[in-house]
């Protein structure tokens, strides 16, 4: 294989890895918007909290003498999902439910306030400096090599791909075949009609926040292990990128969030490799603007018709 092709292949691996985690976080944005038509701008901080919870659990278990990588990560996943889900439920009850019927600007201000509160809460309790995470998966598989370059898939990348696939599969099965999943779809179609038909819409909305928070927590554990460092401010940019992915794919569409995340991750990886890391954010948001100019509802979004 040529060195140029191997280099491109490596960037594709990196892009799919990054895009998978963006897609997981974007699920929360798109599900909440699909049902109540609001953006949860505190969602990125839930991702950050998931990273911190997994770090604390893994560190505690390692101090107890447990050093099996998969067991540590599994415990980190469980703890992060439980705590992040509780935060997601609390955000809905505190920041959204009281203002759900108010103007959207009020809900936006409430969400931004919750985001700032969570960010500063973690900064005060855990410190504002970077925290290094223990590296639990260090292996890699060489896919191809030339004289000066080798394309490889690390164990952590493989873990990210597998976990993302399983999480998306579980969510799809839940939405399509479970009773609560059907209730979620009904609320997404028409919230008022779903309420008239006897569906507990408050419960469905709270569940939507919990599911989104759980997905963000999974992404927090994965990216924390992938990058090896976390701080209280990682949630802002990750949240913005995931929001971009959701809008890119068509906000309100779960498959759109998946596609948008992958496109955004690959675009970032390629721009970092062939231009400069300084331009990756520029390329990401420029791509969003370009897509919205051509397809205002995103790739898989549906146009909304408002009757007056």
From Swiss-Prot:
Transmembrane residue ranges: 22-42, 46-66, 69-89, 105-125, 155-175, 204-224, 246-266, 281-301
InterPro entries, A to Z: ABC_transp_permease (IPR001851), BCAA_transport_permease (IPR052157)
Localization terms from the record: Cell inner membrane
GO BP: branched-chain amino acid transport; D-alanine transmembrane transport; isoleucine transmembrane transport; L-alanine transport; L-isoleucine import across plasma membrane; L-leucine import across plasma membrane; L-valine transmembrane transport; phenylalanine transport
Main location class: membrane
Recorded topology in the membrane: Multi-pass membrane protein
Segment forming the signal sequence: none
Keyword Transmembrane helix listed: yes
GO function terms (MF aspect): branched-chain amino acid transmembrane transporter activity; L-isoleucine transmembrane transporter activity; L-leucine transmembrane transporter activity; L-phenylalanine transmembrane transporter activity; L-valine transmembrane transporter activity
Entry-linked Pfam families: BPD_transp_2
GO cellular component: ATP-binding cassette (ABC) transporter complex, substrate-binding subunit-containing; membrane; plasma membrane
Periplasmic side: 43-45, 90-104, 176-203, 267-280
Keyword annotations of the record: Amino-acid transport, Cell inner membrane, Cell membrane, Membrane, Transmembrane, Transmembrane helix, Transport
Protein family (similarity comment): Belongs to the binding-protein-dependent transport system permease family. LivHM subfamily.
Function, as annotated: Part of the binding-protein-dependent transport system for branched-chain amino acids. Probably responsible for the translocation of the substrates across the membrane.
Name of the protein: High-affinity branched-chain amino acid transport system permease protein LivH
Source organism (scientific name): Escherichia coli (strain K12)
Gene: livH
């Amino acid at each position: 294989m040529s060195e140029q092709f191997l280099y491109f292949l490596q960037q594709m691996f990196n892009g799919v890895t990054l895009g998978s985690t963006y897609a997981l976080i974007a699920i929360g944005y798109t599900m909440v918007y699909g049902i109540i038509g609001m953006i949860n701008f505190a969602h990125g901080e839930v991702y950050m909290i998931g990273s911190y919870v997994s770090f604390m659990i893994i560190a505690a278990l390692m101090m107890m003498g447990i050093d099996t990588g998969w067991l540590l990560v599994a415990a980190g996943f469980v703890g992060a999902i439980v705590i992040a889900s509780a935060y997601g439920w609390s955000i809905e009850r505190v920041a959204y439910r009281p203002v759900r019927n108010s103007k959207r600007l009020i809900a936006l201000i409430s969400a931004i306030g919750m985001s700032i509160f969570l960010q500063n809460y973690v900064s005060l309790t855990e410190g504002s400096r970077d925290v290094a995470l223990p590296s639990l998966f260090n292996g890699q598989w060489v896919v191809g090599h030339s004289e000066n370059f080798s394309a490889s898939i690390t164990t952590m990348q493989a873990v990210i791909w597998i976990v993302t696939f399983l999480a998306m599969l579980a969510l799809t099965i839940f939405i399509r075949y479970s009773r609560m999943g059907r209730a979620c779809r009904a609320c997404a179609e028409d919230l008022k009609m779903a309420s008239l038909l006897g569906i507990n819409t408050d419960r469905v909305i709270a569940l939507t926040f919990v599911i989104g928070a759980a997905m963000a927590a999974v992404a927090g554990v994965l990216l924390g292990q992938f990058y090896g460092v976390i701080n209280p401010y990682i949630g802002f940019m990750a949240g913005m990128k995931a929001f971009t992915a959701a809008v890119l794919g068509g906000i309100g569409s779960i498959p759109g969030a998946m596609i948008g995340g992958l496109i955004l991750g690959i675009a970032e990886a390629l721009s970092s490799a062939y231009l400069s890391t300084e331009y990756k954010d520029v390329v990401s948001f420029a791509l969003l603007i370009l897509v919205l100019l051509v397809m205002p509802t995103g790739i898989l979004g549906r146009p909304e018709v408002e009757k007056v």
